[in-house]
């Protein structure tokens, strides 16, 4: 079964479309200043690509450091491909997450390569880990162990993966005690898998857990996030949570597909929900589509359509929504006590982020129902209403009547004024 088909089948059973937004119950949180990142970025090493990354407010970039690309021949290590990648990222002030993963032909002398490392071959993988971590000590900002082992990227038993993960984290820590280690990289929130991994001791040396809350829409994605937090609470495990992949393709046949027109709304809602739940980092999957518009050879393949932009670095409109969030949310405090409300129905969803590093406050509002609703906003400070699809903005009066629909409104203002939402 192809990856695309398997992805669709699994999501058809596991995902669900939620009609209402779940509001986080964790209280006030501070959004990290380096919250924002993207996957599959930095490979062209071009001025144009890094220019777009800067415009978007990207702090982190992630790529896979394939074992086969580094030690294609047993005992012969070639880091040249990744040296250039890392050096360019550091020169451009981007932090790098290196995913250490997958296999080499020479451990499968009698058969086709699989995404599995048997116990007798683990020492070879650990040697690759040690050499790579030693080579990049002080130059890589985080190491992530494998990718989605509970999905299609691990062909062995859970038990064998837990041992591989445990020993890999141990080897990284021994090689570089200061390394930041991400474990898990789970696809969605596999409760039983996580609990067994914890019981096997595979989380002992890691600094944070990574996961990928893919779902058919942002509401479903946040349900996945809430389940993930419940699982961690059940095992009494406390560590930062990193979202190292989340996104929605604008083409193909994945059930997560969204139109380009609705992508900005999905971007805003997903980022807002994750930030308010206390995620340490969020990396959007991905920076660019595989092909420029009109050049796609297979329009059924959703994997080709996940970008915020195109390979020529022209933007989809979802990129403007990402940039808005990256400009105003870092350093702010998610303030669940705001905005103040009078006679507000529960279908009007609002998230307030106060005192960002730019000295600006942000109010994001949308309606869970399909029809729009008139709501009044009162602020004594001047405010701006931003278009999430274009980056343009317009001024709002001190008291404004707003049409609240399914597409979020993104409002910013300076000062200490507290917003009031009310219906007359």
Each predicted region: which residue ranges?
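Active-site cleft segment of glycoside hydrolase catalytic domains centered on the general acid/base Glu
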Residues: 73-74, 108-234, 252-269, 298-301, ...
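Aromatic/acidic polysaccharide-binding cleft in carbohydrate-active enzymes
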Residues: 254-327, 337-345
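Carbohydrate-binding surface patches
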Residues: 341-382, 388-391
